[in-house]
Amino acid sequence: MKVTRLAVLNTLATLTVAWLPTTDKTITSSNGTDLFKASHGKIRGVNLGSQFVFEPWIATKAWSELGCEGQESEFDCVMKLGQDAANKAFAKHWDSWITKEDIKEIRSYGLNTIRIPVGYWMNEDLIYHDSEYFPHGGFAYLEKLCGWASDAGLYIIIDLHGAPGAQVAKNAFTGQFADTPGFYVDFQYQRALEFLEWMTIKVHTLHNFRNVGMLEVVNEPVQNPQVTTTLRSNYYPNAFHSIRKVEGALSIDRKDYLHIQMMDGAWGAGDPHEHLTDDYYAAYDNHRYLKWDPRVEVSKDSYIKTSCNDNVATNWPAIIGEWSLGVPDNVQETADWKPYSNLDFYQKWFAAQVQNYEQHQGWIFWTWKTQLDEYRWSYRGTYLSGFWQTSS
C-alpha cells in the first residue's frame, strides 16, 4: 500500500459517518442535522479517556490536583482521601475534563462517534462499601455528557472498562491496581451482568442516552484463552441474555436493540463467538498498539508496512476501538521519532492505520485529549499541533 501525506486528509474528507446509525436507524443532532447522511459508513471517533476511569499517565497534573499524586488508581486515591473528600474532588474533575465545548470540538473535526470508558462502580449499588473504594456520583455526569453528545448527533459506545475484581492485574484502566485479575469467577461475572442490565435500562428509558447504540461488555480481558475460558463460555452468552432480557421486558423493538460488543478474536482472549447461540447485533473490538508488540521491528518502514497489512480482526463486524501513534518509550524522544521533527512519518503512519481499519467498520482513536495534547496520544492535539498540514 502506498501512503502519501495527502492520503490522510483525503480519507478524512470522504469518510465522515458511522455505519450503525445509517444501517439500523437515523440519528440527528438537536437542530435536525444528520451527521451520517450520504456516508461511506465508517465509524470514526475518539475515546474519552480518563473522564470516568482515570489513567494517571494521561494527565499527571490533573491527577495531582485531585489529591491523588503517588497513587496508582482511583481505588487507591479514594482510599487515601476518604469517601467524602474523594467524591468532591472527582466531581470537579468530571465537570471539567470533558465539557460541552469538547463535544462541539469533536464534532467540528468531522468525527461521528465517542467511546466512553466507565467502571462497574458507576452503579453504586454494586460497590462493596466495606472493601471497595471508588468515587460516587459519576452517573449524573455520564447522563449529562451523553445528552450533549446526542444533541450534537454523535453516536455513543459505552464501554465497561473497569470490571469487578479487575480483568487484568496492575493496570489503572480497571480502576484499581489489583495484584491478580479477579474478574474470571462466577460472582464477579454476576456483578458485571447486573451492571449491564442497569445500564441497558438507563439507555432505553432516559432521553439523554438516545444515541447510545452499543455496550461493550468488558474491555481488554487477559490475552490468554486458557484464562478466559469461562469468559467465553459463561460471561459472553449471559451478557447477551441479560441485555436482551431487559430489552424484552421494556418491549424494545428489535431494530432498536443495543449492539453488544466483545473483544475480537484477534485480541488474544479466544474466539468471542465460540459459545454464542444468539449473535443478533453482535459487534467486536480490537485494540492495536504497535508500541507494545514485540513481534514488530521498531523502524519507520516496519511500522508503515505492518499497519498497511495488519490482520486486525477475525470477527465481523469489528471496530478498532483503541489505537494511537505511540512508539516504544526507549525511542519516543530520540531524533528519529520525536513528533515535531518527524511529522511526515507520523502522517503516513496515521493514514496507513486509518486505511486498514476502514476496511472493517472503522476506528476510535485513543484518546481525545491528554494533559500535554501531544498528538501521538491526543486526537485534539493533531489539530492544535498542525499535524494536518500538507507541506513541510
Curated annotation (Swiss-Prot):
InterPro entries: Glyco_hydro_5, Glycoside_hydrolase_SF, Glycosyl_hydrolase_5
Compartments (UniProt record): Secreted
EC class (word): hydrolase
UniProt keyword list: Carbohydrate metabolism, Cell wall biogenesis/degradation, Glycoprotein, Glycosidase, Hydrolase, Polysaccharide degradation, Secreted, Signal
Main subcellular location: secreted
Stretch forming the signal peptide: 1-18
Superkingdom assignment: Eukaryota
One cellular-component annotation, GO: extracellular region
EC number: 3.2.1.75
GO BP, one annotated term: cell wall organization
Pfam families: Cellulase (PF00150)
Glycosylation sites: N31
Family: Belongs to the glycosyl hydrolase 5 (cellulase A) family.
Function of the protein: Beta-glucanases participate in the metabolism of beta-glucan, the main structural component of the cell wall. Acts on lutean, pustulan and 1,6-oligo-beta-D-glucosides.
Protein name stated in the entry: Probable glucan endo-1,6-beta-glucosidase B
